[in-house]
Curated annotation (Swiss-Prot):
It is found in: Cell membrane. It comes from Bacillus subtilis (strain 168). The chain crosses the membrane at residues 30-50, 60-80, 93-113, 121-141, 156-176, 185-205, 264-284, 302-322, 332-352, 353-373, 401-421, 424-444. One of its GO terms (cellular component) is membrane. The lineage of its organism: Bacteria, Bacillati, Bacillota, Bacilli, Bacillales. Belongs to the major facilitator superfamily. Sugar transporter (TC 2.A.1.1) family. The keyword Hydrolase does not apply. This is Putative metabolite transport protein YfiG.
Amino acid sequence: MSTKKKEAVIGKESLAHKGLLRTITLVSTFGGLLFGYDTGVINGALPFMATAGQLNLTPVTEGLVASSLLLGAAFGAMFGGRLSDRHGRRKTILYLALLFIAATLGCTFSPNASVMIAFRFLLGLAVGCASVTVPTFLAEISPAERRGRIVTQNELMIVIGQLLAYTFNAIIGSTMGESANVWRYMLVIATLPAVVLWFGMLIVPESPRWLAAKGRMGDALRVLRQIREDSQAQQEIKEIKHAIEGTAKKAGFHDFQEPWIRRILFIGIGIAIVQQITGVNSIMYYGTEILREAGFQTEAALIGNIANGVISVIAVIFGIWLLGKVRRRPMLIIGQIGTMTALLLIGILSIVLEGTPALPYVVLSLTILFLAFQQTAISTVTWLMLSEIFPMHVRGLGMGISTFCLWTANFLIGFTFPILLNHIGMSATFFIFVAMNILAILFVKKYVPETKGRSLEQLEHSFRQYGRRADQEIQNQTTHLS
């Protein structure tokens, strides 16, 4: 075969590899789309379902309806990591698609607040499990040089899901607002992407790293050859084999007795909580309520809330581009400074401009500024780093524990926000978030490492080396004291 023909064949194979990788990414990130829609739709549905004759919600039950999904997501994240480690990333996502469909229908036809809270909890199990499994799956199929952009496409689909929720809320609320069951129409739309996810995952291959961890090296290499050039696949399977030597045992909590793994878990939990204590989901879940509190009417607040969704999508696209240019750690710190500034201004100007016609527009502008920093830097980096830092044999469990903490923090914020807003007002509530942002910046500066440009196996080796150095220092100190 001539050189030109060989190059043509290689070029076609390369296009086929990239095409399949894009298909896998698109299909699996429908889990992220559902995550976004199901967390965002409550933003516009709450004012309608809270009314007399519907679910008759009080501030407490309103908080429970919004946050029961988050509590479910915490447990879904915890068990989802173990489930995906045991049954595989692909099969777990297939199960999740069915749970998304069943729980969404349960929420849609809920006759009272208690049933709604129960089905929102079940929906949360699916959301939490997806929040662990999908980024892990994407990280494990991605080449190191493209991992950042591929994994953060899940974050893009999350905010697209939220934008779709806000848009459908505004359209349905404006055109069918007189209907008693308008909120049910908002909720049931989520069954459509769940059906797409289920059918799509039937044609997607399993994670090669999960297959290798189960001793199925031949299957792992076969999958890698579908999404990599042959030489790259061969090199990658060697790295994977080397990484799992001596770690073929079943993952369990006993693994966290090792100091280097315990340190990674500490960092993972910290990163997860940092993402939440910015207060982002108080805006994503209660944006309509915040704008009503500032002075907008319900219909205007629903429409204004679309701006939050649009800026989130634009910001994540920009963040994905930035990840190819900028290191993770500086992005995270700059994002935190930006969100803290926006929250501080909301708190101050809500006092200065209280009762004026300008206040709702100022609050809307500042929430857009807040989301620009949050979605460009913090949210994109959070999910990416959580999928990167854990070693292969505890990746599902470690990410599950970290994401459990993320959703627990999310639940606490989601539940307490409407209560705080009702009792201490908007300004004081946002000042609390400013204080928590300061603590978050200090944590990132002290503990969070840089992960850009390194394979998952190289990161694991680096953490192991750190652990050995720490052990040696402790041993030297013990020897010196004795």
